[in-house]
Amino acid sequence: MATDVTETPAPLVDAAPEAPADAPAAPAADANAAKAKKATAPKKRASPTHLPYAEMVSEAITSLKERTGSSSYAIAKFVEDKHKAKLPPNFRKLLNVQLKKLVAGGKLTKVKNSYKLSSATKPNPKPKAAPKKPKTGAKKPKAAAKPKAKTPAKAKPATKPKPAAKPKAVVKPKTPAKPKAKPAAKAKPKTAGAKPKPLAKKAGRAKAAKTSAKDTPGKKAPAKKAAPSKKAATPVRKAPSRKAKK
């Protein structure tokens, strides 16, 4: 006889999820891509703080003022003394390279082992003289303006002649003429005082007056000239006195 066998089903077990095979390769690919970007990206150089080499070299040559030109050593020393803090450590190597470029570009001329500025790079002194002309033109109007200020000052003295009224003081000398007449008046009292003298003296005076009048006919003797007639009459006075003594 056949027996029935009952099969019991096996319990279901959850299968663990399989990890993707590409998972560990993904981060490695990202790292390689980042490195490639860094390699291709250009490095930014720090901008130099010093002046361009062309300017520094031309400044050194013009300041040194050497007839045969300045050597690379002299140029390097001058630039280092002036721009020492701003220069890179390999400055001398870069300077030699720049000197060769400047000679090739025609900005410098090499004579043996020295360098000179070419005629094209030398500064032209003519532009400096050009700005001087407007200065002189500006000064001329100033000189023209000065006489205008002086002319009113000159006109003021013309008004000053008003004190011409001062000549009134010149009229004062007329008053001294009056005292001249006073001495004549003083002389008259002397003649009045001579009246007590004898009549003989009066007759002598009259004769002397007549003789003086004859000597000067037609001329009227002024009052002042009467005084000398008295002096002429004095000898006549002495003559009668001598006769009286006899």
From Swiss-Prot:
Biased composition (Basic residues): 35-47, 129-189, 198-208
Alphabetized InterPro entries for the sequence: H1/H5, Histone_H1/H5_H15, WH-like_DNA-bd_sf, WH_DNA-bd_sf
One protein family per Pfam: Linker_histone
Gene3D superfamilies linked to this entry: Winged helix-like DNA-binding domain superfamily/Winged helix DNA-binding domain
Keywords: Chromosome, DNA-binding, Nucleus
Listed GO MF terms: double-stranded DNA binding; nucleosomal DNA binding; structural constituent of chromatin
Keyword Signal: no
Transmembrane segments: none
Cellular component terms (Gene Ontology): nucleosome; nucleus
GO biological process: chromosome condensation; negative regulation of DNA recombination; nucleosome assembly
Alphabetized CDD domains for the sequence: H15
Keyword Phosphoprotein: no
Source taxon at top rank: Eukaryota
Compartments where found: Nucleus; Chromosome
Region (Disordered): 1-51, 105-246
Segments forming domain H15: 49-119
Low complexity bias: start-end ranges: 9-34, 224-235
Family according to the record: Belongs to the histone H1/H5 family.
Purpose: Histones H1 are necessary for the condensation of nucleosome chains into higher-order structures.
Protein name: Histone H1
Organism: Zea mays (Maize)
